[in-house]
């Protein structure tokens, strides 16, 4: 989306320059258009930098900022377009529209949250992620304003604080949450052991669990910029809130992982 929005001021600027400079040759139109496109992108980056200064670096927010969300989602779509990522989606109709939920998925690449957040952009959705992602230049403050939460898996008490915070936001109907229970990327594409405690978010908030899978993101870095990457996002099943509440996290983990391994063939 942002990719095309940047073309609008670039084309308009090029048209103005052309009509104000009658002696300008047609051969100069393409370089001028390219220069205006780059300039428009630089202005957007500058805007994001300035806006990031107004977001608290360590603060947890209790509502999503529509302004920061719009800018971040636009950037997300822009990056996906520039990287020539074609997303194939299956089962999106299974995602609840009448309640919040916890979204869980396998994790193969740093592109996973970008792809899946874009696919689920119709739903207010925040991610639980590692603390280092919240400290990233410019992006960190932006995702915090979108209610993303850091989780310290090395400290059980801090992790529980994050789980409770996510559950509270869900109960307050602020947003749904997404988490990768593996806790890190699988470099072999095989499903890694899950942190069962991640599912406590759904139990505490009394919401369903949406189980998704992602395939193909592990090839994006190798394909850019020469080849298009095909990524497959599938919504496998939705576990009702009643079942989530009545089942232990270990049993839920065993059931979900078993089905996910069978679906992925790993």
Model segments located where?
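Soluble extracytoplasmic domains of inner/organellar membrane proteins
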Residues: 166-167, 190
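Catalytic core of membrane glycerolipid acyltransferases/transacylases, capturing the structured
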Residues: 52-73, 81, 97-156
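Membrane-anchoring hydrophobic helices of lipid-metabolizing enzymes
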Residues: 1-18, 22-100
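Short acidic-hydrophobic, aromatic-tinged amphipathic segments that line or gate anion-handling sites
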Residues: 89-90, 149-152, 241
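Residue-level preference for the first positions of well-ordered beta-strands
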Residues: 100-102, 174-180
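A cross-family acyltransferase "interaction/gating" segment
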Residues: 137-141, 145, 175-178, 187-251
């Amino acid at each position: 989306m942002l990719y095309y929005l940047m073309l609008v001021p670039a084309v308009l600027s090029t048209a103005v320059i052309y009509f104000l400079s009658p002696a300008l040759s047609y051969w100069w139109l393409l370089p001028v258009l390219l220069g205006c496109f780059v300039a428009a992108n630089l202005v957007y980056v500058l805007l994001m930098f300035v806006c990031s200064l107004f977001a608290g670096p360590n603060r947890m927010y209790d509502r999503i900022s529509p302004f920061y969300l719009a800018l971040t989602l636009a950037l997300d779509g822009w990056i996906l377009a520039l990287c020539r990522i074609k997303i194939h989606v299956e089962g999106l109709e299974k995602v609840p529209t009448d309640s919040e939920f916890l979204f869980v998925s396998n994790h193969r690449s740093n592109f996973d949250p970008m792809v899946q957040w874009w696919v689920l952009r119709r739903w207010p959705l925040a991610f639980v992620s590692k603390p280092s992602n919240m400290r990233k230049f410019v992006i960190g403050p932006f995702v915090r304003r979108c209610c993303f939460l850091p989780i310290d898996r090395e400290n059980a008490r801090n992790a529980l604080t994050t789980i409770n915070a996510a559950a509270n936001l869900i109960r307050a109907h602020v947003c749904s949450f997404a988490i990768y229970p593996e806790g890190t990327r699988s470099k072999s594409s095989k499903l890694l052991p899950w942190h069962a405690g991640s599912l406590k978010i759904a139990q505490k908030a009394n919401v369903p669990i949406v189980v998704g899978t992602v395939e193909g993101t592990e090839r994006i870095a190798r394909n850019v910029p020469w080849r298009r990457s095909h990524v497959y996002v599938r919504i496998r099943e939705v576990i009702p809130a009643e079942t989530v509440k009545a089942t232990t996290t270990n049993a839920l983990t065993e059931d979900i992982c078993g089905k996910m391994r069978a679906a992925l063939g790993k």
